[in-house]
């Protein structure tokens, strides 16, 4: 009987954890993302743990597919269905590695979430600041939150001190493609090489 009781408790706890959803309010959503990241990035956590947890967070909170389409721009029209599937598969791996490798060396980042600016029904900008330390100045960070589905906001871009990371990535991808005479599949090689490092 006790065994059955503990199994039921375990299943209930597991269901509660899996069914956790971030807030639908863009500002609160970003606050929850920031708070969760702080817990992941404490000094006592290993780099492997940080990488795993940050990847899980990104898969839940970032519109990776949307970022992938934006990063490719009009070049996506040159891909057939199978090539697009391969690109999206590679981009997700590329994005997660790029995202986690930038953050795992941080420990206990202090970010204050400040205000929101509703651009239109699809986008809200959430403004925040990475507080200064003895070694680094404060950094202004704007989160571009995609709100087409109001029940599930997703991050589409980070704008750091006025520099859009998504736009920078789009320009880098375009440079690779243009260097290879417009051959989009050459970008696949670049993505594979980055993931394999």
Question: Model features per residue range: what roles?
Answer:
Residues 71, 91, 115-117, 129-132, ...:
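A mature extracytoplasmic/lumenal domain signature
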Residues 97-139, 190, 194-197:
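Surface-exposed, charged secondary-structure patches
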Residues 138-167:
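Short beta-strand edge/turn micro-motifs at domain boundaries
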Residues 1-2:
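N-terminal secretory signal peptides that target proteins for export/translocation
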Residues 157-197:
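Low-complexity, intrinsically disordered terminal/linker segments enriched in charged
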Residues 23-103:
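Early exported N-terminus immediately downstream of N-terminal targeting peptides
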Residues 16-21:
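Sec/Tat signal peptide C-region and signal peptidase I cleavage site
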């Amino acid at each position: 009987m006790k065994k059955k009781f503990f199994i039921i408790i375990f299943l209930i706890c597991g269901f509660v954890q899996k069914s956790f959803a971030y807030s639908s309010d863009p500002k609160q959503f970003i606050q929850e993302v920031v708070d969760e990241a702080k817990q992941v990035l404490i000094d006592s956590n290993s780099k492997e743990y940080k990488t795993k947890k940050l990847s899980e967070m990104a898969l839940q909170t970032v519109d990776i597919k949307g970022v992938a389409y934006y990063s490719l721009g009009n070049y996506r029209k040159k891909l057939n269905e199978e090539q697009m599937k391969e690109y999206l598969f590679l981009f997700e791996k590329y994005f997660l590695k790029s995202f986690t490798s930038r953050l795992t060396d941080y420990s206990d980042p202090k970010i204050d979430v400040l205000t929101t600016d509703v651009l239109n029904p699809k986008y809200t900008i959430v403004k925040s600041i990475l507080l200064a330390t003895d070694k680094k100045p404060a950094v202004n960070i704007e989160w571009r939150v995609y709100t087409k589905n109001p029940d599930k906001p997703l991050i589409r871009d980070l704008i750091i001190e006025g520099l859009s990371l998504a736009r920078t990535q789009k320009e880098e991808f375009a440079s690779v493609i243009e260097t290879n005479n417009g051959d989009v599949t050459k970008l696949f090689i670049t993505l594979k090489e980055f993931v394999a490092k």
